[in-house]
Regions:
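Long, compositionally biased, intrinsically disordered segments
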Residues: 13-14
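Extracytoplasmic/lumenal domain signature
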Residues: 1-9, 21-27, 36-91, 96-241
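Generic short beta-strand segments
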Residues: 32-33
Length: 241
């Protein structure tokens, strides 16, 4: 008899804007975790999709068997909750496509465990390196010091990721080594926002309301600005923070 599947894999949401690669006629998108078991191979992944046909070209899965539902991490779990619960390692950031000094290209993404991986977009997404921006082991869970959620930035020398409590990390895309780490003063300050880079300067927002300007060469702080203050708006009303 014919068998009809009533339920198929769910999850793998795309949190982020896709990255366009005109040279290969492809777009790249990061995906989240699965919400049903067994998880699809395209969850917690970067997917390359043909820009003309919409067909999948290749996919790199950063975390396997990650089935997670936000309403299931409390004491009252329903029968619909996955067991065991996965580590919740979504790739929430847009992939970064950059060209190395050698002319070779690299596609980078980050996970909630602060893992950063580089793929070869010209070789079916072959893994170039995988490292941890927080300085810990790769493949860990969210119990570590750092987490990458919202995105990074790149220039000719480095790729930059705000790794939460682990600070702002500059990574050499040729080797996967950390060039420097900026950690602001004060306890419990997380740098989770996506940084912005211009020639010579990286801008990074903090959970303490501070905006930091950091030297792209060595990670030294250039200045800081406290956004938690009163501002006069365009209609002369005063707003705070």
């Amino acid at each position: 008899p014919n068998v009809v599947g009533l339920y198929k894999p769910a999850g793998g949401a795309a949190w982020n804007a896709p990255t366009v690669d005109p040279a290969r006629g492809a777009i790249y998108v990061g995906t989240g975790d699965a919400t049903t078991a067994p998880p699809a191979k395209t969850t917690d992944a970067i997917m390359a999709i043909d820009i003309n046909s919409g067909k999948l070209l290749w996919s790199y899965q950063a975390t396997e068997n990650d089935v997670f539902m936000g309403g299931c991490n409390g004491p009252n779990r329903s029968e619909a909750c996955p067991s065991p619960m996965g580590p919740d390692m979504d790739i929430g950031n847009s992939p970064i496509l950059t060209t190395l000094p050698s002319g070779k290209r690299a596609l980078l993404g980050g996970t909630k465990s602060a893992d950063v991986f580089a793929l070869d977009p010209d070789n079916n997404g072959a893994l170039l390196f995988r490292m941890n921006a927080a300085g810990g082991p790769t493949g860990g869970g969210r119990g570590g010091r750092g987490s990458i959620v919202w995105g990074g930035a790149a220039d000719a020398e480095h790729v930059y990721y705000g790794a939460g409590a682990a600070g702002l990390a500059a990574i050499r895309p040729t080797t996967g080594e950390r060039a420097w780490v900026f950690q602001p003063q004060g306890r419990g300050v997380a740098l989770g926002a996506a940084p912005t880079v211009i020639p010579g300067v990286v801008f990074q927002g903090g959970s303490n309301g501070m905006l930091y300007a950091v030297s792209a060469a060595d990670g030294k702080q250039l200045w800081e600005f406290d956004t938690s203050q009163d501002f006069e708006t365009v209609n002369r009303m005063v707003a705070h923070g």
